[in-house]
Design a protein with these regions (language model features):
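Glycosyltransferase catalytic domains, chiefly GT-A lineage
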Residues: 2-463
């Protein structure tokens, strides 16, 4: 019979309890180690070493995106499998979509200007010309960048190379903020079918040549892995963010032979075969344009509020752009609208270059050129103005997060105008851009003083 201690507990009972505690201790220790390993895994995916540890950041073909240190803390990104077909070789490329709405689209390349005024890349679009450009007709002529002698000049060797490019994966690096990241899971068929074109400025080509291996082919073309580097000389804008909008939005102007294009931002590593992307997002649903829903915002007014809070552009100029849009009939997004959001994830754009899609791109760029360079603000406005003439696919954000790995910029981007709080501060400190955003300084043909922006309710603490 077991002896009992003073507390009335048998010695055998105490020994049994000590023995039972050991497995619990082992379980607790195992859980602690698992949490420690998980923390290291998440840290490694977000650290610079993720480039070398990328295998740890992927699972089952679904990509775990490393977080951007410039973004505010947020909940873990929701990812889902992309319903692509199994084999790129099995994809049947359909006939091109006929141009049924806008049959002929041409571009204004020379503006009326003072004799001593330099040409502007985006032109000197008047308020009347802007309004007329939204009236869709069978034949249209609009501003679309690339005014004569205004910059963004391409080397002859690159201009000749792109003549053959009908299927394009395009990206861009400006002001040395990134280095090219090699795409993964690219089939042999797509390697032969697609041109992978990395558009860079002179600052970036110098930075890239100093930090990665650049090979020069027999014709003088420069390559980093699969990427053909295309250097643009004479940047058209003072602000690097605006320069980056040229290849992003005006892909059809830079590469006019392209039938299809996929744009990805320079800090991204593409993880899905581009032919599978076109099949999933364009051909399967018979769309000509696809873009993902924004992870946090639906309304341009909520996006504008986030831009101001995060100091992504001068607050009074963001307010002015939104006041113009609100005055012109752009209501906050709600579930009754025909699109799931007015705000896209603009880092990935998937397009068939029909005339209506190219018109949309021109009008979108014109808004970016006229107002702030924050293209997510103007995207929904242009969609609103074009109405039912533009049918496109806004796909789930969880699929967007599975298309790529996101790498950090090589350094933080910031310009002084982004921190400005008042118009007098911008003027006094000489922060006004000289070649872009001129609509923010040109008298608007209506009184905006009584316009009050709609109240903004934050739907996400991370946004």
């Amino acid at each position: 019979m077991a002896r009992r201690g003073k507390g009335g507990v048998g010695v055998g009972d105490a020994a049994w309890r000590r023995g039972a505690a050991r497995p619990r201790l082992l379980v607790v220790s195992a859980v602690a180690w698992a949490l420690l390993l998980l923390a290291f895994h998440l840290w490694s995916c977000a650290s610079p070493s993720a480039y070398f540890l990328s295998a740890l950041c992927r699972k089952g073909g679904e990509v775990v995106r490393a977080s951007d240190p410039m973004e505010p803390p947020s909940k873990p990104l929701h990812r889902c499998s992309i319903p692509v077909v199994d084999d790129p070789d099995a994809v049947v490329i359909p006939k091109r979509t006929p141009n049924e709405i806008v049959k002929k689209l041409s571009y204004i390349t020379v503006d009326k200007r003072d004799k001593d005024s330099p040409p502007l890349f985006g032109g000197r679009q008047t308020w009347k010309q802007r309004e007329e450009s939204f009236k869709v007709n069978a034949t249209m002529k609009v501003h679309c960048g690339f005014m004569k002698n205004s910059g963004a000049d391409m080397d002859a060797v690159d201009a000749e190379y792109i003549q053959k490019c009908k299927f394009v994966v395009a990206s861009g690096i400006f002001d040395g903020y990134d280095i090219p990241h090699q795409p993964s899971n690219i089939s042999l068929r797509s390697q032969k079918l697609f041109c992978f074109l990395m558009v860079v400025d002179e600052v970036s080509i110098d930075f890239i040549e100093q930090n990665v291996t650049v090979k020069v082919d027999s014709e003088g073309g420069k390559w980093v892995g699969i990427w053909r580097l295309v250097t643009l000389h004479r940047p058209p804008f003072d602000e690097p963010r605006r320069n980056g909008k040229v290849p992003k939005i005006l892909t059809h102007r830079l590469f006019p032979q392209a039938w299809y294009s996929i744009w990805i931002d320079g800090k991204m590593e593409l993880m899905v075969d581009p032919l599978l992307i076109l099949e999933r997002y364009l051909w399967r649903g018979k769309y000509t344009f696809a873009v993902a829903v924004h992870k946090h915002h639906r309304s341009i007014y909520e996006e504008g509020d986030a831009i101001k809070r995060r100091k992504r552009y001068a607050r009074p100029l963001v307010d002015l752009q939104m006041k113009i849009y609100y005055h012109e009939g752009m209501e906050p997004w709600d579930a009754k609208k025909r699109t799931p959001s007015d705000i896209p994830e603009g880092a990935v754009l998937i397009r068939e270059h029909t005339t209506i899609v190219d018109l949309f791109s021109c009008l979108w760029f014109n808004e970016v050129n006229l107002f702030t360079p924050r293209d997510q603000l103007s995207f929904g406005y242009v969609v609103h103005r074009l109405g039912d003439t533009l049918k496109f696919f806004m796909f789930p954000n969880c699929e967007y997060n599975s298309l790529f790995i996101l790498h950090r910029h090589t350094r933080e981007h910031s310009s002084k105008v982004e921190w400005a709080k008042t118009i007098p501060e911008i003027v006094k400190n000489g922060l006004k851009e000289s070649r872009g955003g001129l609509g923010l300084w040109t008298p608007y043909p209506a009184d905006l003083s009584s316009v009050k922006l709609p109240a903004v309710k934050r739907t996400s603490q991370a946004g």
